[in-house]
Amino acid sequence: MVKNFFHIRRLKKILAKIKSFEKEMSSLSDLDLQKKTDEFKKRLADGENLDQLLPEAYAVVREVDKRILGLFPYDVQVMGAIVLHEGNIAEMATGEGKTLTATMPLYLNALSGQGAMLVTPNSYLALRDAKEMGPVYRFLGLTIETAVRADESKPLETKEKRRIYQADIIYTTNSALGFDYLIENLAENKKNQFLREFNYVIIDEIDSILLDSAQTPLIISGAPRVQSNFYDMMNTLVQTLYEDEDYCYDDEKNEVWLTQKGIRAAESFLGLNHLFSKENQELVRHLNLALRAHMVYKKDQDYVVRQSENEAEVVLLDRATGRLMELTRLQGGQHQAIEAKEHVKLTQETRAMASITYQNLFKLFRKLSGMTGTGKVVESEFLETYSMSVVKIPTNCPVIRRDYPDQIYQTLPEKVFASLDEVKHYHAKGNPLLIFTGSVEMSEIYSSLLLREGIAHNLLNANNVAREAQMIAESGQLGAVTVATSMAGRGTDIKLGPGVADLGGLVVIGTERMENHRIDLQIRGRSGRQGDPGISKFFISLEDDLLKKWGPDWIKNFYRDYSPEDFKNNPILLKQRRFKKLVSKAQKASEGNAKLSRRLTLEYAQSMKIQRELTYAERNRLLEDTNEMEEEINRVIEYVIKQVAYEQSFENRADFYRFILHHFSNRAERIPQEFDIHSPKEVSHLLQAIAEQELLAKKSYLKSDKLYSQFQRLAILKAIDENWVEQVDYLQQLKSALSGFHTSNKKPIVEYYQEAYDGFEYMKERMKHQIVKNLLMSELALNPKGEVVMYFP
């Protein structure tokens, strides 16, 4: 808090400078205010920097916000805006106006002409905020675009994306930006690229995107794999095994492994002598996937089974938000293993073509900043990973919400019935109620109980998100009852209806503590915005997932068989001190493990990051470089020929001839009888002659040097892309194989780095051979329009 005090004191000095321009700006005409943008751009060109422009620029935006929106940013919002410009995180409580705060740093950083972005967790918020704030930027002469559509089933065209990403200010989502970055780097020519260099970004709900979503990399999938028939077999095998006897599960690390007894049981089931021999690698991989499907991935917590008209499908859930992740599939066969577990039709397993984590995506920006209501508790991780401080901004009005102590019960039914009594009590008074649950299953249980009590309510979970923002916005009305999972409606203001403040405000009921304290704070923060009254209370049982997974062993002594009806009328509250500390200790253990997992994800992603940057840099060089490539191509051909001549052996002339037909030319003449296939010198001479002949034929056919250069680039590009896709897919498979299954005494991450490096070196070798094959074995033809069409092998 001492550090935050000095931050605030420094911010107030800058705030005073901004306020000193207030009278001047209010006296300007609209036209004079609009002219300020060109003035600022000229001052930048003359040598001033953004920090020097900040006081006056913020004063301009503040005045325009007032004239266009009728909203004059509070002092605390201006302080938050200063933090955002400095590349740090502004912690601002729910309802403090983060959307308006962002107008100031977005305008200032867009003045450089290099672009500024605001990234939100979902398209609804991006579209809403851009629509509401857009008039401010347009008034000031800046262009604003949204890189998402309301209908996500209709993707944006490349031409449209290029126009969008050239805008001064862009509102988008983290997933849309990530996929656009990956698509950009799969483009075959400059015409299909649309991004410019990443400059400045504000991430809304930054902790949700950079921390809670850190475990899920963005992946573009491509060509389907040959479908394995092992999924159902391994699902059946796992169902015959017993936990602790045949396999062990570490729920803290989410790791599962077979015991010696389990290995023997698997060998017996599969009719094998040695399960872990090299030829059984695929079986072991599928067994690992099946074990993880049953032990690590929980229905209605990690995924839901959604029924459509004809068939069911597995859709992943975001644990932090409770939202469906429609476009995301687990890689490496894990998704198919879960489908086998749930007995739904297996989807096609696809290859990963490109992948990036959110951490590495946002590190591509020159300057990164963010907003959240709950960043201070994880400031150390933001400092360590992103070198960003978290500054807690004071609220504009004092928070008068009443946060009651946790109500702890022994059993789950006691907790449910006690919380239901609380709901009935406040509902009878007319207070609006927002009831948060930790899973889809629990939200539906509460919904059923409320219906049984005759209490009308809205249910908001992953199975019902169409009206999410509207439901949350209306949840502050008199008598409203809303049941929601985790952090539904984050970013949507809840305004109290008439008469609600007199009753004590919105009542938030948490039906369990979540796996990190930030989500609990966010749940509480739904009530008591902008000085409104409010009430929050959590109900906990010793049987909650958090305590079962992270609590001490002694709480198991309190578990016993019972009938839920036993506790309906007389729930017993646990008041001893040791129970009070139980939850915070369990949360700290959970948060510590989550932090380690994120660090491990970053470590695994490091190999991919280095390899991706090297590969993309080479692709971009090819797309942008206009110089002749003859020397470079000749070096590659010479290298490949030398390798074939000196390192590859052929049984006879027919074997060597087959090699030539497959790799150098399908028009080559037969090998002369006197040719010595064991002479590297003769092999080199022959292959060099064939290569020169093929290249000369293609150059003659194309006639134009420009077309020939285009052909050369495309041949190299195809080789890079095909081999990079193989490498990305290999790294995904490798991580899946090493990260969750104990088969070796080595540290999995060390083994991964070594294998990943070896794989990359092998990829570069394959790539050179593929370049030669593409250059020599491709077919050229004219289409009916007279255009040259290139067919690569």
Curated annotation (Swiss-Prot):
Binding site for ATP: Q77, G95, E96, G97, K98, T99, D493
PROSITE patterns tied to this protein: SECA_MOTOR_DEAD
Record-linked InterPro entries: Helicase_ATP-bd (IPR014001), Helicase_C-like (IPR001650), P-loop_NTPase (IPR027417), SecA (IPR000185), SecA2 (IPR022490), SecA_DEAD (IPR011115), SecA_motor_DEAD (IPR014018), SecA_preprotein_X-link_dom (IPR011130)
Highest taxon listed in the record's lineage: Bacteria
Keywords recorded for this protein, A-Z: ATP-binding, Cell membrane, Cytoplasm, Membrane, Nucleotide-binding, Protein transport, Translocase, Translocation, Transport
Loss of function: phenotype: Loss of export of cell wall protein GspB; glycosylated GspB accumulates in the cytoplasm.
Intracellular or extracellular location(s): Cell membrane; Cytoplasm
Family per record: Belongs to the SecA family.
Complex and partners: Monomer and homodimer (Potential). Part of the accessory SecA2/SecY2 protein translocation apparatus required to export cell wall protein GspB.
NCBIfam families named among the record's database cross-references: PRK09200.1, secA2
Name listed for the protein in its UniProt record: Protein translocase subunit SecA 2
Species of origin: Streptococcus gordonii
